[in-house]
Swiss-Prot record:
Its main location: cytoplasm. GO terms for molecular function: uracil DNA N-glycosylase activity. It comes from the Bacteria. It catalyses: Hydrolyzes single-stranded DNA or mismatched double-stranded DNA and polynucleotides, releasing free uracil. SMART domains: UDG, UreE_C. This is Uracil-DNA glycosylase. The active site is at residue 64. One of its GO terms (cellular component) is cytoplasm.
Length: 226
């Protein structure tokens, strides 16, 4: 895993020294040696590199990384440029079109959001090839719980977007006297029609940011020239 060089450094290095994380690292060494694991090691902490602690405005919580070759690059819901946009993200784009009138882009690369203060955080940061949730019990949940707790300690408000039961289980770590929670159904094709479409969480997040005197998120992902 690459070294963090922004203001997450102090927070995360404290985690890295804890017993559970030392065990997690040992497990990962074995997993990467014996199986095909995503994302590439250098990308595991990508979300933290791209969105410094002090600049987090919105946390968009995912579950575990995409588990097919070339998809995952350390940002929840995002895929590399040359990869077909996955179904959940297609549904997010449909909601953005309906909510904010944005066009649906030809790629699923969400780094633009990260650079504006949207922490695209999965609750589990690695996965075996073709085995969803295969790393959900190796220690990542403790790590991401502590990341959420550290953001909760901030005085500056954070908007937490929690879709699906896995994300909503983190609600208990968030003080709603200071912070904001937008929660609902997961954008997966299995559940999107049960309340994800029409949730308007993207415009609602911007409305909150505007009221806080913060710059709104430009949610439009641009087309990539092919």
């Amino acid at each position: 895993m690459s070294k963090i060089n922004n203001d997450w450094k102090e927070i995360l290095e404290e985690e890295f020294e804890k017993e559970y994380f030392i065990k997690l690292k040992e497990t990962l060494e074995e997993e990467y040696k014996n199986y095909t694991v995503y994302p590439p090691k250098r990308d595991i902490l990508n979300a933290f590199f791209l969105t410094p602690y002090s600049e987090v405005k919105v946390v968009l919580l995912g579950q575990d990384p995409y588990h097919q070759r070339g998809q995952a690059h350390g940002l929840a819901f995002s895929v590399n440029y040359e990869i077909k946009t996955p179904p959940s993200l297609v549904n997010m784009y449909k909601e953005l079109q309906d909510d904010l009138g944005l066009y649906i882009p030809n790629n699923g690369f969400l780094e633009k959001w990260s650079k504006q203060g949207v922490l695209l955080l999965n609750t589990t940061l690695t996965v075996r090839d073709s085995e969803a949730n295969s790393h959900s019990k190796i220690g990542w949940q403790t790590f991401t719980d502590n990341v959420i707790k550290s953001l909760n300690e901030r005085e500056k408000p954070v908007i937490f977007i929690l879709w699906g039961n896995n994300a909503k289980s983190k609600e208990k770590f968030i003080d709603t006297n200071k912070h904001y929670i937008l929660k609902g159904v997961h954008p997966s094709p299995l559940s999107a029609n049960k309340g994800f479409f029409g949730c308007k969480h993207f415009s609602e997040a911007n409305r909150i940011l505007k009221n806080l005197g913060e710059k709104e998120i430009d949610w439009q992902i641009e087309n990539k020239e092919i």
